[in-house]
A protein has these predicted regions:
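Periplasmic-binding protein-like
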Residues: 121-130, 187-190, 222, 243-253, ...
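Hinge/beta->alpha junction and helix N-cap segments in small-molecule ligand-binding domains
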Residues: 76-87, 103-114, 163-173, 189-211, ...
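Flexible loop/turn connectors
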Residues: 237-340
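Alpha-helical structural signal in soluble globular domains
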Residues: 43, 92, 96, 201-213, ...
C-alpha cells in the first residue's frame, strides 16, 4: 500500500500542498484560519500521514533533535550503558525533551572523531556533553554556534551552560565519614585521574579530609583505572591480597564500589568487618549491594532534566548550576571505635 504524501493530505483537506506544509511545520501565516488548520490536521490523522523529518528540517532549519555525547573512555567497550548513572541521566533527559517536542540522539565519539564532528554530521539543534575535559573539543563545539550544555565537564572554554555537583565536597564528606568512624588507612579507588574532572576533584576532597586528620595520601592506596564493575572486582581482589590492607576505601562511583565488594568477598574479605567501603552516586546498585552501600548521593535525574531545560531555553546567557551532595548511611562502613 502506497504511503500517503503531502498531495494526498491536500486533496483530502481541499487545500493546496503549500497550506499543508505550513500547518505541518507550524509556520505562522495570517491567511490560515483555525478551520483550515483543523481540516488539514484531521486529514493527516485520517490518512495516517507521517511527515518526513528530513524535509521538515530543511523547511525550518531545525531538526528538533538534541544530542547527548558521552565519552567512550574504554576502547571497544559498551561503556555508556554499563553504568547506571547514564541510564538515570538519560531517562530524565529523554522524558523532558519529549514533553517539549524534541527527540534525543545518544552517541559516543569514536577514536579520531571529535564531538563537534558528531554534532555537525547529525544536524543537532543542541548538544549535551557528559564528562568532557578537553579544551580543544570545547573550542570546536563553540564554533558550531549551537546551544551546548556541559555536564560533569571541566574545560576552560567559556560561553557554555554547565551542570555539575560539588565533587570536591562529596569526596571530602566521604573520606571524613570514614575517618570519623575511626578508620585511618584509607584507599581511593577511581577512574582515570587527569589534572581536572570529577575524579580529580573527588580526589582533592579525599586529600583535604586526610590532611584535616593529620594524614597524607599514600601513593600505594591511590588506585585509578576503569569505571566499571569488572575493574571494581579486580581492585577488590588486589586489595584483598595486600599484606597491609586499608581499613577503609572511598570509591568514586557506585558501580566500582559494588564490584569492589564482590572482589573482596570472593577472596574471603568481609565488608564492613574487615574493610569499610563508601561509594558515590547513590544509584540503584547501592541499595542492591550486599551489604547495602553507604554512599554519597547526587541527583542524577535532576542533572538530566536541567540539562535539557537549559538547552531548549532561548536564553543563551551561560548558567553554571552546581547541585549539592548528601551522605546516605547504609551498611558498608563499620564504626571502628566500637572495636577499640
Amino acid at each position: 500500500m502506497k504511503r500517503p504524501g503531502l498531495k494526498d493530505v491536500a486533496e483530502r483537506a481541499g487545500v493546496s500542498i503549500a497550506t499543508v506544509s505550513y500547518v505541518i511545520n507550524n509556520t505562522p501565516s495570517q491567511s490560515l484560519s483555525p478551520e483550515t488548520i483543523k481540516r488539514v490536521n484531521d486529514a493527516i490523522k485520517e490518512l495516517g500521514y507521517i511527515p518526513n523529518q528530513a524535509a521538515r528540517t530543511l523547511a525550518n532549519n531545525k531538526s528538533n533533535l538534541l544530542g547527548v555525547l558521552i565519552p567512550q573512555t574504554e576502547s571497544g567497550k559498551e561503556f555508556m550503558f554499563s553504568n547506571p548513572f547514564y541510564g538515570d541521566f538519560m531517562s530524565a533527559a529523554e522524558y523532558t525533551a519529549r514533553k517539549s517536542g524534541y527527540h534525543i540522539m545518544i552517541s559516543g565519539a569514536d577514536s579520531g572523531q571529535t564531538y563537534a564532528e558528531v554534532a555537525r554530521t547529525r544536524g543537532l539543534d543542541g548538544v549535551i556533553v557528559v564528562g568532557m575535559n578537553d579544551d580543544e573539543e570545547c573550542r570546536q563545539l563553540k564554533a558550531l554556534n549551537i546551544p551546548v550544555v556541559l555536564v560533569d565537564s571541566y574545560c576552560e572554554a567559556s560561553g557554555f551552560h554547565s551542570i555539575c555537583v560539588d565533587d570536591k565536597q562529596g569526596g571530602y564528606m566521604a573520606t571524613k565519614y570514614l575517618l570519623e568512624k575511626g578508620l585511618r588507612k584509607i584507599a581511593y579507588v577511581t577512574g582515570q585521574i587527569n589534572d581536572k574532572g570529577v575524579n580529580y576533584l573527588r580526589y582533592q576532597g579525599y586529600e583535604k579530609a586526610l590532611e584535616e586528620f593529620g594524614l597524607s595520601p599514600e601513593k600505594s592506596l591511590l588506585l585509578a583505572g576503569e569505571v566499571s564493575f569488572e575493574h571494581g572486582c579486580k581492585m577488590g581482589e588486589y586489595l584483598a591480597g595486600l599484606t597491609e590492607r586499608p581499613d577503609g576505601v572511598f570509591v568514586s562511583a557506585d558501580i566500582l564500589a559494588v564490584g569492589l565488594c564482590v572482589g573482596l568477598r570472593e577472596k574471603g574479605v568481609r565488608v564492613p568487618e574487615d574493610i569499610s567501603i563508601i561509594g558515590f552516586d547513590d544509584s540503584l546498585l547501592s541499595r542492591a549491594c550486599d551489604p547495602p552501600l553507604t554512599t554519597i548521593h547526587q541527583d542524577v535525574a535532576d542533572k538530566g532534566t536541567e540539562a535539557v531545560k537549559l538547552l531548549i531555553n532561548e536564553d543563551r546567557t551561560p548558567q553554571n548550576k552546581v547541585f549539592p551532595v548528601t551522605l546516605v548511611e547504609r551498611g558498608s562502613v563499620r564504626d571502628n571505635h566500637s572495636f577499640d
